[in-house]
């Protein structure tokens, strides 16, 4: 992984988890090797070196599971539309200073690399003028470029996000146009048309989290169904840490859960 040239700053990891999941009910409590999924995620967050790990949920059962395994847990409202909104409530409850770095470790990522969690926190600390940091990796499979479930990000010369999209960006005109619309025959991306896949891991400055709930939803956020575009619409800059290690997938479906359970010997 590409790490920033800075010592790891103090940071807080928050694991937002909710029971309401249409594809996998009670997902945070799913058993993985004898422990609930949310606990597996919190353990990975702890391994990242975070000075504090919090589980945030609107479900008492999730809070109890976290506390039973020694993790701090905080009750949040049930009406949050996103994990970022849940983090914003936690930031308000704890009253963290403006420059406190808070990493959102999604509650369905039991295989997340602790080094990546630490990496985005360090990258934000080194990215002055940015309120948010996230991560991405180069795409090598042409099929992923044209998959709308794979979010792409275009970076500027400083590694700051220019745009996130489900569309194939940047569009390599000379390489793709002769094959369009036959996606199966598209060539693999190559320099200078490097395509980056966004990794859904975020570090925030607490000051931004306090302002986030007051930001109006943006048209591009609604069209793309990507909440990070709200911050960009309102002028916030997002620093992107590029890693060449492809992260292991999270758990969205029963099949995903079975795959992860097998890795833990469940």
From Swiss-Prot:
Spell out where the chain crosses the membrane.
none
Main location group:
cytoplasm
Entry's localization field: Cytoplasm
GO annotations under biological process? Answer: CMP-keto-3-deoxy-D-manno-octulosonic acid biosynthetic process; lipopolysaccharide biosynthetic process
User: Mind telling me which Pfam families this protein's record contains?
Assistant: CTP_transf_3
Gene Ontology CC annotation, any one: cytosol
Question: What does the UniProt keyword field contain?
Answer: Cytoplasm, Lipopolysaccharide biosynthesis, Nucleotidyltransferase, Transferase
Q: Known EC number(s)?
A: 2.7.7.38
Q: Which InterPro entries match?
A: Cytidylyl_trans, KdsB, Nucleotide-diphossugar_trans
Molecular functions per Gene Ontology = 3-deoxy-manno-octulosonate cytidylyltransferase activity
Identify the pathway.
Nucleotide-sugar biosynthesis; CMP-3-deoxy-D-manno-octulosonate biosynthesis; CMP-3-deoxy-D-manno-octulosonate from 3-deoxy-D-manno-octulosonate and CTP: step 1/1; Bacterial outer membrane biogenesis; lipopolysaccharide biosynthesis
Catalytic activity reported: 3-deoxy-alpha-D-manno-oct-2-ulosonate + CTP = CMP-3-deoxy-beta-D-manno-octulosonate + diphosphate
Signal peptide annotation = none
Class of enzymatic activity (EC top level):
transferase
- Key word Thylakoid present: no
Extract the NCBIfam families matched here.
Answer: kdsB, PRK05450.1-5, PRK13368.1
The function of this protein is: Activates KDO (a required 8-carbon sugar) for incorporation into bacterial lipopolysaccharide in Gram-negative bacteria.
Q: What's the family? A: Belongs to the KdsB family.
Q: What is this protein called?
A: 3-deoxy-manno-octulosonate cytidylyltransferase 1
List the source organism: Paraburkholderia phytofirmans (strain DSM 17436 / LMG 22146 / PsJN) (Burkholderia phytofirmans)
